[in-house]
Amino acid sequence: MLDEYKLTHLKQLEAESIHIIREVAAEFDNPVMLYSIGKDSAVMLHLAMKAFAPGKPPFPLMHVDTTWKFKEMIEFRDKYVKELGLELIVHSNQEGIDMGISPFVHGSAKHTDIMKTQALKQALDKHGFDAAFGGARRDEEKSRAKERVYSFRDKKHRWDPKNQRPELWNIYNSRVDKGESIRVFPLSNWTELDIWQYIHLESIPLVPLYFAAKRPVVERDGTLIMVDDDRMPIEPGEKVEEKMVRFRTLGCYPLTGAVESEATTLPEIIQEMLLTTTSERQGRVIDHDSSGSMEKKKQEGYF
């Protein structure tokens, strides 16, 4: 009889993720779900809603706002969270804002450290969260490929890849001392294609930036950067052009490259994913600061 009941691979992934989310809610005193407004966050939030239906997730959402996100992302965030009736904490590094930190002036490494990493650590300390959900997947990037589902962080929020706990089957060690925490990745075993197929299957709402449209872009160092507001300086020799583009990954607009595409629907995006040979994070400028830059950022407290 058991052999007759088989889950599709998407339903298996869904069940695993829901188990992890419920496990965290049961084991930790003060968890939070990081909501970056991207496709992975959208899937993770959808799974959290399913995990506790018909009730609401017993933890708040939190968005670390660098003040450089795409306008459409912020509009979507506020509208969608309101529709779901969830608590949303928005945190920005006020010190960085007062310093006028800008990815254009100070570069991606300094901007990311101050406005993302330090801001995240500030927020986690301020609210005393002992577990934080994130939407990272192992197929995204090499340092994430070796990260546990329960990723242990010390009292300074640092990640030591050599000091992680074994995870046997679906057994997770949630023990932490005061001040320590766990970053939890329920989507660890999903791929980018899985994410898109699940979004299509479940009709999950997304920021329109993921779909191809005519957008004003500038080509800079081989990357198509969308001109999202008047803070973007146009350098000599550069020209703003309207191109049919979409985004495979979303972050701060000056540090996120668009890809030329004609995919305006979910089936077209899935077809594109089946044919692509490049990583979705190829368009993230912060990943190219230096060799192993993502691992270094994570060791400093980055998600």
Curated annotation (Swiss-Prot):
Signal peptide location: none
Documented EC number(s): 2.7.7.4
GO aspect biological process, one term: sulfate assimilation
Pathway noted in the entry: Sulfur metabolism; hydrogen sulfide biosynthesis; sulfite from sulfate: step 1/3
Pfam families in alphabetical order: PAPS_reduct (PF01507)
GO molecular function: ATP binding; sulfate adenylyltransferase (ATP) activity
Spans annotated as Disordered: 281-303
Gene3D superfamilies: HUPs
Keywords recorded for this protein, A-Z: ATP-binding, Nucleotide-binding, Nucleotidyltransferase, Transferase
TM annotation in the entry: none
Reactions the enzyme catalyzes: sulfate + ATP + H(+) = adenosine 5'-phosphosulfate + diphosphate
InterPro entries in the cross-refs: PAPS_reduct_dom (IPR002500), Rossmann-like_a/b/a_fold (IPR014729), SO4_adenylTrfase_ssu (IPR011784), Sulfate_adenylyltrnsfr_sub2 (IPR050128)
Function: With CysN forms the ATP sulfurylase (ATPS) that catalyzes the adenylation of sulfate producing adenosine 5'-phosphosulfate (APS) and diphosphate, the first enzymatic step in sulfur assimilation pathway. APS synthesis involves the formation of a high-energy phosphoric-sulfuric acid anhydride bond driven by GTP hydrolysis by CysN coupled to ATP hydrolysis by CysD.
Assembly and interaction partners: Heterodimer composed of CysD, the smaller subunit, and CysN.
Family in the record: Belongs to the PAPS reductase family. CysD subfamily.
Record-given protein name: Sulfate adenylyltransferase subunit 2
Naturally occurring in which organism (per UniProt): Saccharophagus degradans (strain 2-40 / ATCC 43961 / DSM 17024)
